[in-house]
Amino acid sequence: MNLNRRQFITSTAAASTGLLLTSLTSFAKPIMPDSQSGYSLLIFATNWGFTGSWDEFASKIKQAGYDGMEVWWPTDEKNRAELLEVLNKHKLQVGFLVGSGEKDFQKHLAQFQQNLSAAAKAKPVYINCHSGKDFFSFDQSKQFMDYTEKINKETGVPIYHETHRGRILFAATIARQFIEKVPGLRLTLDISHWCNVHESYLSDQEETVSLALRRTDHIHARIGHPEGPQVSDPRAPEWSDAVKAHFSWWDKVVETKRKEGKRITFLTEFGPADYMPTLPYTRQAVANQWDINVHMMEVLRKRYA
C-alpha cells in the first residue's frame, strides 16, 4: 500500500511537471515587428500582500529581476521618505497608484486631486489611477479625466486610468463611451476585470476591446476568467484558454509600441488570499503568489524584450 502510494505521488508529480512544461513552451516568443528606436519594456512588482519593510521588498524584487515597483502613493511623510530612500538605494523605478475610497463625489474628487498632484511631484515613471466609482455619472467621472490631463501637461508624468471593477472604467461598454469622447484618455489595461464583469473572453466586443488596446500604455498582467478576476495558477493547463486570450490582447499592445518606438510597462499583479482562491476552513491559498508573479515577469521579459 505504501509502495503504491509512493508510486502514485511520483507519477503524479512527473505528470504535473510535464503539463507545466507544456503550458510554458506553448507561449514561445511571437513574431513581432522590429522595434523602432525608443521602444522599451519595464516590468514592475506589486507589494500587495507583502508584509515586510520597504527595504526587504525592494531587495527581493531587485534580486528577482524586476525594474521597479508599483505601490500606493504614501500619504504619510515618514513612510514616503523611507520609500524614496529605498528606491534610490536599490536603483529601482516606481509607478504610483492613486485613488480614493470616499463615496461622496465631491470628497472623492478632492482627495483624488490632492493625492494625484502630490504623487506627480515625485516624478514617478507613471501614475495609475483607481478613478472614481462605478456609480458616478458620466459628467462627474469626466472631471477625473480632465484633471489628470491637466496634471500630465503640467508635469510630463504619464497618467493612466485603470479598467477596474468598482471604478469608472469597470466595464468595456462604459469605457468605450469615455474612449470615444475623451481623446486624451490613456489606459492601464487590467482586462481580467472585464472578463469577470462580462462573464466572457469578450469575443462579442472585439471592436470595443480594440479601441481600448490602442489607448493602453500600461498593463496589469493578471489573468482572469468569466467567473473571476484571477485564475488559480496561470501555469496550470486547465487555464490555457484564459492565458491565451490575455496574451493575445497584450501582444497587440506591445506590437503597437514596438512599431511606434514607445515604452510599455507591465505590473505582475496576481494577488494574495482571498483574491487568490483559497481552501475552505483554512483560507490557505491554493498557489504561491510570489512564484506566480515572478513566473509572469520572466515570461513577459522573454516574450516582449
Regions found by a protein language model. Give the residues of each.
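Hydrophobic faces of well-ordered beta-strands that scaffold small-molecule active sites
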Residues: 37-46, 69-71, 94-99, 127-129, ...
